[in-house]
Amino acid sequence: MSTLYDNIGGQPAIEQVVDELHKRIATDSLLAPVFAGTDMVKQRNHLVAFLAQIFEGPKQYGGRPMDKTHAGLNLQQPHFDAIAKHLGERMAVRGVSAENTKAALDRVTNMKGAILNK
């Protein structure tokens, strides 16, 4: 039985999606200020590992718990929605099926409380 990780193209696909997502974040007027001053190479590596893990790939995320990482950022629902929108769009451009994109976004949504630190 294949996993969501396999179905979306594994590590190379996740890395490409995250790279494209970061380009979108950098030009998004809502999101860019949140990431100002962030080490984006480190953030990229954490995000790739996090997504790989929640998509049933290798257990490689070794960062702090999400709620601790995002404490003090004052992330709100519009921030989450914008990132989810960009993530879904980047997955579609990468050729991930609508079904697998929805499954991936559902898994990210399941983490929303920790992501928004609420």
UniProtKB/Swiss-Prot annotation:
Keywords: Heme, Iron, Membrane, Metal-binding, Oxygen transport, Transport. Its cofactor is heme. It is a peripheral membrane protein. InterPro entries: Globin-like_sf, Globin/Proto, Globin_bac-like_CS, Hemoglobin_trunc, Hemoglobin_trunc_I. It holds the Pfam family Bac_globin. It is found in: Membrane. One of its GO terms (molecular function) is oxygen carrier activity. One of its GO terms (cellular component) is membrane. Binds 1 heme group per subunit. Heme binds at H70. Monomer. Belongs to the truncated hemoglobin family. Group I subfamily. This is Group 1 truncated hemoglobin GlbN. It comes from Nostoc commune. The gene is glbN.
